[in-house]
Amino acid sequence: MPNPAETTTQVRLDKWLWAARFYKTRSLARDQIEGGKVHYNGQRSKPGKAVEAGALIRVWQGQDEREVRVLQVSEQRKSAPLAQLLYEETEASLKKRAENSEARRFNSQFAPSPERRPDKQERRQLIKVKQY
């Protein structure tokens, strides 16, 4: 007998994001959708939006933006390797994320980081500089 979750053609957007392991809980997924961090086929949507295979979903996670195409629809949360079979990330998205990570890596290399905390005299000099 086929599993009803596997034969489903439509699933709520928040449930699909949870099942595909973009978010740990459905409530986190719902909050991100309502906050405009998730776009379905180029438009903001609601958590109850029905997800269908072939749809394009844009998800912001931290500093990265991922654009994925839905390959399969599932209501059940599965292991990470099986969850990755539910979608594929677009080439443009992969390229953009790689460029952004390189830029962040180079920025952190050139950012000055002090070797130690400033002592009392150096703190007073910093305060004087900041006041002017």
UniProtKB/Swiss-Prot annotation:
Keyword Membrane listed: no
UniProt-annotated stretches for the region Disordered: 94-132
Coiled coil residues, start to end: none
Biological process according to GO: cellular response to heat
Residue spans of biased composition, Basic and acidic residues class: 94-105, 114-125
Residue span, S4 RNA-binding domain: 11-73
Pfam families, per the entry: S4 (PF01479)
Gene Ontology MF annotations: DNA binding; ribosomal large subunit binding; single-stranded RNA binding
Keywords of the record: DNA-binding, RNA-binding
InterPro entries cross-referenced by the UniProt entry: HSP15 (IPR025708), S4_RNA-bd (IPR002942), S4_RNA-bd_sf (IPR036986)
Gene3D superfamilies associated with the record: RNA-binding S4 domain
SMART domains per record: S4 (SM00363)
Stated role: May play an important role in binding of nucleic acid. More specific for RNA.
Similarity field: Belongs to the HSP15 family.
Full protein name: Heat shock protein 15 homolog
Species annotation: Aeromonas salmonicida
